[in-house]
Amino acid sequence: MRPETPAKSHPFTRPTRRAALTGLLALAACGPIAFGGAEPRIDATAPVTVALLVPAGSTVQGNDILAANLENAARLAVSDLQGVQIDLRVYATQGDPAVAAQVARQAVNDGARIILGPVHGAEATAVGTAVAALGINVLAFSNNPAIAGNNVFVLGLTPDNAARRVLSYATQNDRGQVMIIGERTTAGELMLAAVNRAAIDAGAQIVATETYDFSQQGIVAALPQMAATARSSGAQSILFTADSAGALPVLTQLLPDNRIAYPQFQFMGVTQWNVPPATLQLRGLQDGWFTLPDPAVTQQFESRYAQAYGATPHPIAGLAYDGIAAIGALLGTGSPEALSRGSLVQGSGFVGVNGVFRFLNDGTNERGLAVATIRDNAVVILDPAPRSFIASGA
């Protein structure tokens, strides 16, 4: 994929789904916009240049496919905009922070008024630094809250979001005495910190924390202490920070074998237990709780994307659509400060293909998530995702 690829039109065989997604964009700003900040100033009645930074040209396997998926989703969103003109220009970062910073500066020289992407945290930090003095905001696809702040906002689903939602649900359902099980890695430490922050917001009580070395041998070695702590701590729930590609399958198999299981203990997690779908077959995850974006709008996007491009979208491709949805909604106000920091953090938020979301003052985000369980190897929604932050009490 070459940088600055011109937009292409795509035929759609089912206009009802297009109308549905277009409707999302028409409603993308969930309420009145409160504007602030002096830069960047734009003419919202003319085409506005948006730079999309993708990891094309990288030596990392899969990055070119991810780059193409992000571009496809962004162009799908641009084609759905009504009353707003976006000149989308695509730049390849090669997955390299130095290259990302270079192309970000080039994008601003080319007229970009906001940057969508890049994917990886180190790239996003480099890009934010490169364009900060120019008053350009960056909507990165990362889910790492540590990189957020100043002119960098993260679009990805952060562990804080998932932990806050599932712990709030646990507290409301008399399962608020929680034991955490996490791995002894840098990523594991970040997840544990997110869960502890979320517990304060959710009113949950962390009664114990157990960790393990990130290996099958490490898990087996830690298992007796995990089981003993679960029994002695008064825990009503056990929250796993691991995902299906990590220790989750092993933990949820071995703990029940040691009489640590539902219904005495409610298993729950801060990762999406329906990804990949084979995870739903795991015996230990049946009746467990996890969070996911609004499945109705997500499935609508996946179907639309498949019709347009003949393939299932990458799991994070929808973030590119969400970014364009937010930008389009703000441009639709006609304000010359539509892409300023103050505009981005307006409290009512936006509607995207992952549900409602809003940017927070610290550069992180809040997303409306559903709480789900697994029954008979299928996802069952326990508490639907909110459709607006006002309705959800925010």
Report the location of each language-model feature.
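N-terminal secretory signal peptides
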Residues: 1-15, 19-29
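Extracellular/periplasmic periplasmic-binding protein-like sensory domains
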Residues: 248-321, 334, 385, 389-392
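An alpha-beta-alpha
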Residues: 156-211
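Short beta-strand elements at the ligand-binding edges of bilobed clamshell
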Residues: 137-139, 146-168, 182, 282-294
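Bacterial signal peptide processing site
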Residues: 31-34
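Periplasmic-binding protein-like
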Residues: 107-119, 138-141, 177-182, 231-247, ...
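Beta-alpha junction/loop-to-helix N-cap segments that form part of ligand/metal-binding clefts
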Residues: 38, 69, 80, 84-146, ...
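Segments of small-molecule ligand-sensing domains
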Residues: 309-324, 328-383, 393-394
